[in-house]
Amino acid sequence: MCGIFAYMNYRVPKTRKEIFETLIRGLQRLEYRGYDSAGVAIDGNNHEVKERHIHLVKKRGKVKALDEELYKQDSMDLKVEFETHFGIAHTRWATHGVPNAVNSHPQRSDKDNEFVVIHNGIITNYKDLRKFLESKGYEFESETDTETIAKLIKYVFDNRETEDITFSTLVERVIQQLEGAFALVFKSIHYPGEAVATRRGSPLLIGVRSKYKLSTEQIPVLYPTCNIENVKNICKTRMKRLDSSTCLHAVGDKAVEFFFASDASAIIEHTNRVIFLEDDDIAAVADGKLSIHRVKRSATDDPSRAIQTLQMELQQIMKGNFSAFMQKEIFEQPESVFNTMRGRVNFETNTVLLGGLKDHLKEIRRCRRLIVIGCGTSYHAAVATRQVLEELTELPVMVELASDFLDRNTPVFRDDVCFFISQSGETADTLLALRYCKDRGALTVGITNTVGSSISRETDCGVHINAGPEIGVASTKAYTSQFISLVMFGLMMSEDRISLQNRRQEIIRGLRSLPELIKEVLSLDEKIHDLALELYTQRSLLVMGRGYNYATCLEGALKIKEITYMHSEGILAGELKHGPLALVDKQMPVIMVIMKDPCFAKCQNALQQVTARQGRPIILCSKDDTESSKFAYKTIELPHTVDCLQGILSVIPLQLLSFHLAVLRGYDVDFPRNLAKSVTVE
């Protein structure tokens, strides 16, 4: 939920101003992950051992407020140059403690800032740790769980058994006492020019840049000599010493830069060479050399971490000519849905091949049940495709909200196939559901938009939706690409079903025409803006439909409430008489999605009920639908496609409507209050 960014320059001279600029740009790339408050920690002016100082600057509000605050710091000389320096930065989405400067990160160990730490995640046992530390005389100043980590590493350091204990050993001892999810980056006055980072359940990657040859492409993983059982004994173990053969560095001890971040969008402008850390990895940089340690060894551990090349371009994470990332991403959907299908759907032979699933296809076809699990928009993509998946696979399909799935301890069997949908691949509840299903022997399939994410690594197989980076907090293009990915799975599963060939060909023809039809829908933007002008002063809104378009209503209502803060509700039209009809009157805006599909006649019944109660329905309908338009207050006519894909076309007007409503109401579309893009805590 929070954004972590850190930058180390080793033998690369940088002024403090240049370091600030790098840190701030990194935070701005991560601001969609949280924007309650932000902070940085950099070296002070003194380099003498007894006078070393870490300067903290923290500010409530967005990164821009922090940027302005940095240049008000009279005590810092922006022109001073550092040949080697390590700076850390953080943008926060509050989970413990209100958004203010004291609760912002970096959190510190004491008033002298001996150790500072930035954190993404939640420490579930922080109260016990805090109680222990308070009993040892450590004083706390914030309400955060993160401050416990800073105080704990200070405790380990204060009680060290030897003066030459390494920074990574301290961190190793600390994380064995932590329960919950975390990505952490540490800085200390006792280890100048050194960095230590670690993760468990929250994402963290390291970018490396050097104009010189690197020592290796595979960094070996190192292990400690023993494990620590409890917090009272954490000062009694040793880490073995390192040598250059176990580290990544520029050959000849030359200049090198390291970038630590929660995701790749903050790194790509600097380098496309990255290392994805695994859970419980501890990455340490000292003297320009990166080493990776692990707390425990298991038989399934990969013995090394490879440097990978990001397939991303900087322009993909820039707004271009659009006023907001969300608007840009809505208008990117003709390209994003094409990219999702590219190389997978052969329109000449009517075949579909998902390379990430091909090795497990026989096992998937033998399954007895499909379980599709997600949260928010990803859950809606599952709802949208449930009917066509049942039709094409001829299997029962359960669609589950990850949190509810876990709360119920849902029975899962070895002959189930479980899908986990997440744009970021890091959604905490979905990740926990994945581990729950793996423990019960089910085959697990990930559907994500992020290479190297936790879900993509931990599932048995998966589909990368190839939608491109999505920065706007309100998901748009990821939804339509997830939708198509699930449809493609159904098509692949039904390839040898003779009775379904005509239906398959109809759907594949629909997929082929989809990018052009989306462009046609996007051309209605001005008309939708005019509709928003009529609606933006309203306090509540109903969106109703049924069949294939029920998910459209859920997703449209979610988009409206996410970024406009209007109350909106997605209603199954078949449930209208069972309560929601009581809300309908001439003041209540009602949007109805009525398409020429098998539910058309039933939707007409719902329309009659709404108009009979003096409702003024705004209808999304097919171009040739004269019947619905007779009863409509307003209509938005959409091109027609095959019924199971119509939801892709009908959701786009609701995405546009939510965008225009938010702008007219004066809200920041890309940064809705209380929300973050990547939900990495429960």
Curated annotation (Swiss-Prot):
InterPro entries: GATase_2_dom, GFAT, GFAT_N, GlmS/AgaS_SIS, GlmS/FrlB_SIS, Ntn_hydrolases_N, SIS_dom, SIS_dom_sf. Residues 360-499, 531-672 form the SIS domain. The keyword Repeat applies. Controls the flux of glucose into the hexosamine pathway. Most likely involved in regulating the availability of precursors for N- and O-linked glycosylation of proteins. Keywords: Aminotransferase, Glutamine amidotransferase, Phosphoprotein, Repeat, Transferase. Gene3D superfamilies: Glucose-6-phosphate isomerase like protein, domain 1, Glutamine Phosphoribosylpyrophosphate, subunit 1, domain 1. The active site is at residue 2. GO terms for molecular function: carbohydrate derivative binding; glutamine-fructose-6-phosphate transaminase (isomerizing) activity. Pfam families: GATase_6, SIS. The gene is Gfpt2. Substrate binds at residues 377-378, 422-424, 427, 578. Its EC number is 2.6.1.16. It catalyses: D-fructose 6-phosphate + L-glutamine = D-glucosamine 6-phosphate + L-glutamate. GO terms for biological process: cellular response to leukemia inhibitory factor; fructose 6-phosphate metabolic process; glutamine metabolic process; UDP-N-acetylglucosamine biosynthetic process. Pathway: Nucleotide-sugar biosynthesis; UDP-N-acetyl-alpha-D-glucosamine biosynthesis; alpha-D-glucosamine 6-phosphate from D-fructose 6-phosphate: step 1/1. It comes from the Eukaryota. The keyword Lipid metabolism does not apply. The modification Phosphoserine is found at residue 244. This is Glutamine--fructose-6-phosphate aminotransferase [isomerizing] 2. Residues 2-288 form the Glutamine amidotransferase type-2 domain.
